[in-house]
């Protein structure tokens, strides 16, 4: 797979926060990825509430049989990036707001949430979002 920077390199992440140093983590959130016999692909939990100013370490474990990704962004950014991925399905993410998680593995993403906003996390591998791989993050005061 060829790497690409996609939307996030072109965007200013200030409105959703920013990557952060592991030593500044104030909260850890475990997220699991699973696939069901009925064909659904899910993040658990699929709704996360975070206080503004919190630096979070997401620990994402893929318990499924397929590779997945955890992509964090605004609803608009994700929609744009989803279109990009449909045109370039073999591109690997190098975005600071995304991690790829092969089957049976765990990955981490450290992010500081600096403004009140609503965000989405999603797997943008073709067909995965449609199979249920998305969730929301509500950043509150």
Language model features with spans:
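Extracytoplasmic entry segments of secretory-pathway proteins
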Residues: 1-34
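Extracellular/periplasmic metallocenter environments
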Residues: 2-13, 95-141
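Beta-strand cores of secreted/periplasmic/IMS beta-sandwich domains, seen most often
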Residues: 17-20, 45-71, 107-115, 119, ...
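Short beta-strand and strand-turn-strand segments in soluble, beta-rich domains
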Residues: 39-40, 86-95
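Short aromatic-acidic-glycine turn motif
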Residues: 76-87
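N-terminal edge beta-strand
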Residues: 23-55
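Short, compositionally biased
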Residues: 71-78, 125
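Short edge beta-strand segments in beta-sheet-rich domains
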Residues: 26, 67, 130-134
């Amino acid at each position: 797979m060829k790497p690409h920077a996609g939307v996030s390199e072109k965007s200013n992440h200030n409105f959703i926060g920013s990557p952060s140093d592991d030593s500044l983590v104030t909260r850890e959130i475990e997220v699991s990825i699973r696939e069901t016999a009925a064909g659904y692909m899910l993040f658990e939990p699929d709704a996360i509430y975070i206080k503004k100013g919190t630096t979070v370490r997401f620990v994402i474990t893929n318990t499924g049989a397929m590779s997945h990704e955890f992509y964090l962004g605004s609803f608009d950014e994700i929609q744009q990036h989803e279109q990009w991925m449909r045109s370039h399905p073999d591109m690997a993410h190098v975005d600071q707001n995304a991690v790829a998680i092969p089957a049976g593995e765990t990955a981490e993403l450290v992010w500081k949430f600096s403004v009140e906003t609503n965000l989405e996390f999603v797997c943008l591998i073709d067909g995965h979002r449609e199979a249920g791989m998305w969730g929301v993050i509500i950043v509150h005061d």
